[in-house]
């Protein structure tokens, strides 16, 4: 039994079955067929641990979002202390944290007037594409064949056809792909 407080699983196999049923059967099958039916249990620093406790060096780091390693103690502490005062906020109203952070960002980037916040990489790509279209008054976007830029709106349209086609990317003629 693997008990995580809010949820539990009888076995690794039962978790794999639930992941295939409710999350992403394609990824579960891909890794199982590749001989790597690993289930990540937790992450610390530059290591991952599978459900059996086996420690592995994380060479993937999922797009470079963990430059300090997973769950870096200083960052965990800052986040915890921040939660004593701040919450997720409301993007419609000014906030203390958002204004202070925006000011710091703008002051570090020459010729920047505003900071725009996004929830993740796909949203950052969306913002960049919309900004480029607005600034140039042009619609066409050039991206790299088989590239991955996210799974939302414009970002999915710039990526691999296997994703853009199934999500019915609008106006495919506006997206040109070139070799890397």
Task: Put a short name on every predicted segment.
Residues 1-44:
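Active-site-adjacent loop/helix segments that line or gate small-molecule/cofactor pockets in enzymes
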Residues 39-47, 64-80, 91-104:
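A structural motif shared across PLP-dependent enzymes of the aminotransferase-like
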């Amino acid at each position: 039994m693997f008990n995580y407080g809010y949820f539990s699983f009888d076995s690794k196999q039962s978790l794999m079955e639930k992941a295939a049923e409710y999350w992403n059967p394609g990824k579960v099958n891909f890794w199982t067929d590749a001989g790597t039916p690993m289930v990540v249990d937790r992450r610390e620093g530059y290591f991952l641990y599978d459900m059996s406790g086996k420690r592995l060096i994380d060479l993937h780091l999922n797009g470079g979002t963990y430059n300090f390693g997973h769950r870096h103690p200083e960052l965990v502490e800052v986040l915890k202390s921040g939660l004593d005062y701040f919450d997720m906020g409301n993007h419609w109203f000014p906030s203390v944290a958002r204004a202070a952070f925006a000011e710091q960002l703008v002051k570090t980037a020459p010729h920047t007037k505003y900071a725009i916040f996004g929830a993740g990489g796909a949203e950052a790509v969306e913002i960049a594409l919309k900004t480029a279209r607005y600034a140039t008054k042009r619609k066409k976007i050039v991206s790299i064949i088989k590239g991955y830029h996210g799974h939302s709106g414009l970002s999915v349209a710039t990526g691999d056809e296997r994703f853009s086609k199934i999500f019915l990317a609008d106006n495919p003629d506006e997206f040109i792909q070139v070799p890397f």
